[in-house]
Amino acid sequence: MWNEFKKFAIRGNVIDLAVGVIIGGAFGKIVSSLVNDIIMPLVGLILGGINFSDLSWKVGKAEVKYGAFIQTVVDFLIIAFSIFLFVKLINTLYERVKKQEEVKETAPTLTKEEELLTEIRDLLKQQRETT
C-alpha cells in the first residue's frame, strides 16, 4: 500500500496539481489585495468616498453585507480574467509548437540511399540532356 501511495504522490499530475494549488492560493491573495486595497478604494473615491466593505443592509438583527459581496465579485472577475489570459497564452504556445511539429513531419527526410539515388538520377538526366 505504501508503494502504491508513493507512485501516486510522485506522479507528475499530482505534483503539478499541488504546485498549481499553492501558486493559485498565493495569486488569490495578491488579487484580493489588489481589489481590496487599490481598486475598490479608487472606485469608492470616484463614487463619493464610499467604502464598499462597509456597505450593508440591516434586516432585523441580520446584516446583509452586500459591499463585501461586491468586492468578492470584483475579486473573482479579476482572477477569472487572469486565468483566461494565462490559458489563452498556453494554448497559443501549444498551437505554435504543434504547427512546427507538423511542418517537420511534412518535410520528408531522405535516407543516405535515397539521397544517392536522387543524385544518380539527376546526373543521368544531365547526361541525357547534354547528349
Curated annotation (Swiss-Prot):
Enumerate the PROSITE patterns for this protein.
MSCL
An example Pfam family from this entry, by short name, is MscL
Name the InterPro entries for this protein: Mechanosensitive_channel_CS, MS_channel, MSC/AndL, MscL_channel
Q: Which residues form a coiled coil?
A: none
Into which family does the record put it? Belongs to the MscL family.
Function statement: Channel that opens in response to stretch forces in the membrane lipid bilayer. May participate in the regulation of osmotic pressure changes within the cell.
Q: What is this protein called?
A: Large-conductance mechanosensitive channel
The organism encoding this protein is: Geobacillus kaustophilus (strain HTA426)
